[in-house]
Amino acid sequence: MARNDIRPIIKLKSTAGTGYTYVTRKNKRNNPDRISLMKYDPVVRKHVEFREER
C-alpha cells in the first residue's frame, strides 16, 4: 500500500472565520469521519475548533 492511502494529508480550517489552517495527517482506518480539534488560532489569539476540510 502507498503511504498516502492510509494516512492522507488533511487541512484543518478554523471555525472562527479567520481562514487560518493547520496541515496534518490522519489515519483513515481509525478515523473515517471528519475530525475536529481544539487548536490555537493566532489571528483571534484564542483556542477555537478546527474542522477537517475536504
Swiss-Prot record:
<dbReference type="InterPro" id="IPR001705">
    <property type="entry name" value="Ribosomal_bL33"/>
</dbReference>
<dbReference type="Pfam" id="PF00471">
    <property type="entry name" value="Ribosomal_L33"/>
</dbReference>
<protein>
    <recommendedName>
        <fullName>Large ribosomal subunit protein bL33</fullName>
    </recommendedName>
</protein>
<dbReference type="GO" id="GO:0022625">
    <property type="term" value="C:cytosolic large ribosomal subunit"/>
</dbReference>
<dbReference type="GO" id="GO:0003735">
    <property type="term" value="F:structural constituent of ribosome"/>
</dbReference>
<keyword id="KW-0689">Ribosomal protein</keyword>
<dbReference type="InterPro" id="IPR038584">
    <property type="entry name" value="Ribosomal_bL33_sf"/>
</dbReference>
<dbReference type="InterPro" id="IPR018264">
    <property type="entry name" value="Ribosomal_bL33_CS"/>
</dbReference>
<dbReference type="GO" id="GO:0006412">
    <property type="term" value="P:translation"/>
</dbReference>
<dbReference type="InterPro" id="IPR011332">
    <property type="entry name" value="Ribosomal_zn-bd"/>
</dbReference>
<keyword id="KW-0687">Ribonucleoprotein</keyword>
<comment type="similarity">
    <text>Belongs to the bacterial ribosomal protein bL33 family.</text>
</comment>
